[in-house]
């Protein structure tokens, strides 16, 4: 009891910051997300990522242990080995929860509690950092309350909110703050820790980063490099500079090996491109070339930086003395910002929305760098460093109550700048309908299938995780302990997955329920299966399914393409019609077609002023324009046929407008005629 009281007394201000973070979380998301057996809100998210995180954990939980790969998952893309790492299911938590699987409920999610933990850690660590930079003593109540207000800037850091329950593992912004805290604790403490203790600390950070999300490895790694730069400037000796880096890298690599990062099938590792940051975007919103490249640090961060600079100018002598006493750590911080700028920009340098230049780099370096292809995320490090440093300097160089008022204004400004996102999250997560079961699999026959014991595996005929039915089917398989032959993975080689799934259809198994989604229905005549339809989904089975009525065979399988999924240039598209103007182009959604002969019929108007063709080709590989035979040519209908002796991956039809005559496309129907 005495030790607990002493701990609470010593860390009361950091715990207050953590409480602030937790309260913000509860206000935004409510308490229902904390219920470990409530999962519908995860599956109802319009993005596939939360479903990936949760169902990845469920499949992993039901997959057996396979040493030495504790993170191996054989259930998600059966019979191949994947890793819990590539479903972004917070691997460390997944492994721990799998070990405790015998005492956990059958339906269990940890994402809600993880979110609460992230917000609390963000607030607690932010307060501790701001207080330390601000030179605040534990007994200085006024300034400590000011540091808690400053922590509000970090609790409202944009990346934390935007990633929470979207890319949930990436919401661990607190890992960067923890690394900064370890740095300051080690370098400003009167009793500096030994090199061995530093190796232990940074080894733990390597363990956390590799076990939560890979993008934190370079961010925290750069903080480590900065600490070693400082130690080098202070001439601590080679061991003090090198060994913490060795410890961090060795622990992270060992953990990645155990998690199966290097032994996963379908892992592409590198996307082959870089999505870099516009560094002006740290202070100016909307400059990111895409949502993924938006790195805005918030209005409150900008305000804090301006106020910190003003304080330094007003108290120039005090500031000069402060920087003189901390020269080495300031130099190391500048090195850190430069490193982060280079890493986050990629090889194409943009500033203020304008591309300045592109640096050619060797392919070997590109392949390594592109493992972190969304490298703009690395700029979060600079944003958080500037935020905590600025808030700390405001606390140090503005007097008394003024600092508290200014930091409160900064926190309020941070929230005001995020008001649209915060309101959206509050509205979404406080809507009772968001927690309802909205699966499209409502036919009672689904549960009969699960209870029959006839099936233990689900197999998709082709690789398409973007279809609505896909996630309902995968959730059904995961909930009932079945395996699936298809899943959405990070860094996945989609080409290999597409080719593999098509090949698996050559060997049919009686314990497998086959799902034919969209264009896959065209191939139904190719396989000696018994076919059934539940909730509009075509299912196939080697053996008859007792209690279900088989769907009659069709003479010519046909399916219509979804026009609203088309890519349209110089035109408009909705569910019914695509209209092309002068120079317009329509490119349909991508399908996988099995070997055979096909007829494609386009209905609409103005086709006598168009150019129509079909193409196919794997992602980032050569695209092949097909030889087709037009059997019907009219202004309101175009028909062409073709044959293929092998599967066609990412097959599409294109329509180009040749002049200023408008072209309307109302239906594109594909038939398998042989």
What does each of the following model-derived ranges do?
Residues 27-33, 65-68, 149-166, 253-264, ...:
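Membrane-interface helix-loop junctions at the exits of transmembrane helices
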Residues 47-48, 249-313, 552, 558-559:
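Periplasmic/ER-lumenal interhelical loops and adjacent helix-loop junctions
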């Amino acid at each position: 009891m005495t030790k607990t009281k002493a701990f609470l007394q010593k860390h009361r201000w950091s715990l207050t910051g953590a409480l602030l973070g937790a309260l913000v979380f509860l206000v935004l998301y409510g308490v229902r997300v904390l219920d470990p057996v409530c999962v519908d809100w995860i599956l109802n998210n319009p993005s596939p990522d939360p479903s990936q995180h949760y169902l990845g954990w469920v499949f992993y939980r039901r997959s057996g242990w396979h040493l030495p790969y504790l993170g191996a998952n054989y259930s998600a893309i059966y019979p191949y080995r994947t890793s819990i790492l590539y479903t972004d299911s917070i691997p460390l938590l997944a492994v721990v929860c799998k070990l405790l699987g015998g005492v956990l409920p059958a339906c269990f999610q940890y994402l809600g509690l993880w979110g609460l933990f992230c917000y609390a850690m963000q607030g607690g660590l932010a307060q501790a950092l701001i207080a330390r930079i601000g030179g605040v003593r534990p007994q200085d109540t006024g300034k400590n309350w000011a540091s808690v207000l400053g922590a509000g800037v970090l609790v409202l850091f944009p990346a934390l909110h935007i990633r929470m329950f979207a890319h949930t593992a990436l919401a661990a912004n607190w890992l960067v703050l923890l690394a900064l805290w370890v740095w300051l604790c080690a370098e400003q403490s009167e009793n500096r820790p030994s090199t061995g203790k530093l190796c232990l600390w940074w080894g733990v950070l390597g363990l956390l980063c590799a076990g939560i999300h890979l993008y934190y490895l370079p961010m925290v790694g750069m903080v480590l490099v900065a600490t070693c730069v400082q130690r080098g400037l202070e001439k601590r000796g080679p061991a003090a500079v090198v060994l913490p880096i060795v410890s961090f890298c060795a622990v992270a690599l060992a953990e990645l090996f155990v998690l199966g990062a290097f032994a996963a099938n379908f892992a592409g590792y590198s996307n082959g491109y870089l999505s870099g940051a516009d560094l002006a975007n740290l202070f100016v919103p909307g400059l990111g070339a895409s949502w993924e490249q938006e790195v805005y640090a918030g209005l409150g961060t900008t305000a804090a930086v301006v106020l910190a600079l003003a304080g330094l100018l007003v108290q120039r002598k005090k500031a000069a003395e402060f920087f003189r006493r901390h020269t080495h750590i300031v130099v190391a911080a500048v090195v850190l910002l430069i490193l982060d700028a280079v890493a986050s920009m990629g090889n194409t340098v943009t500033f203020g929305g304008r591309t300045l230049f592109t640096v050619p780099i060797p392919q070997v370096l590109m392949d390594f760098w592109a493992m972190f292809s969304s490298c703009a995320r690395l700029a979060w490090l600079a944003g958080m460093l500037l935020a905590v440093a600025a808030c700390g300097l405001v606390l140090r160089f503005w007097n008394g109550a003024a600092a508290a008022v200014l930091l409160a204004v900064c926190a309020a400004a941070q929230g005001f700048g995020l008001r649209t996102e915060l309101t959206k999250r509050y509205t979404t997560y406080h809507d009772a309908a968001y927690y309802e079961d909205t699966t499209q699999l409502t036919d009672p026959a689904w549960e009969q299938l699960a209870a029959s014991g006839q099936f233990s595996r689900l197999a998709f005929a082709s690789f398409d995780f973007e279809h609505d039915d896909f996630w309902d089917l995968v959730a059904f398989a995961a909930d009932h302990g079945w395996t699936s032959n298809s899943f959405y993975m990070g860094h996945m080689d989609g080409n290999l997955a597409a080719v593999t799934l098509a090949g698996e259809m050559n060997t049919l198994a009686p314990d497998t329920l086959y799902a034919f989604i969209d264009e896959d229905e065209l191939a139904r005549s190719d396989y000696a299966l018994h076919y059934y339809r539940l909730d509009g989904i075509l299912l196939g089975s080697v053996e008859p399914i007792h209690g279900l009525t088989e769907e009659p065979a069709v003479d010519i399988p046909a399916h219509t393409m979804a026009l609203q999924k088309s890519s349209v240039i110089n035109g408009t598209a909705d569910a019914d019609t695509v209209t092309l103007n002068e120079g317009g182009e329509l490119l349909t959604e991508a399908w996988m077609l099995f070997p055979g002969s096909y007829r494609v019929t386009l209905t609409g108007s103005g086709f006598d002023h168009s150019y129509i063709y079909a193409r196919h080709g794997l992602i980032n590989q050569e695209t092949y324009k097909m030889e087709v035979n037009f059997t019907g040519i009219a202004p309101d209908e175009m028909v062409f046929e073709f044959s293929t002796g092998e599967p066609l991956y990412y097959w599409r039809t294109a329509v180009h407008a040749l002049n200023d005559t408008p072209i309307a496309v109302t239906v594109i129907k594909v038939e398998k005629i042989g």
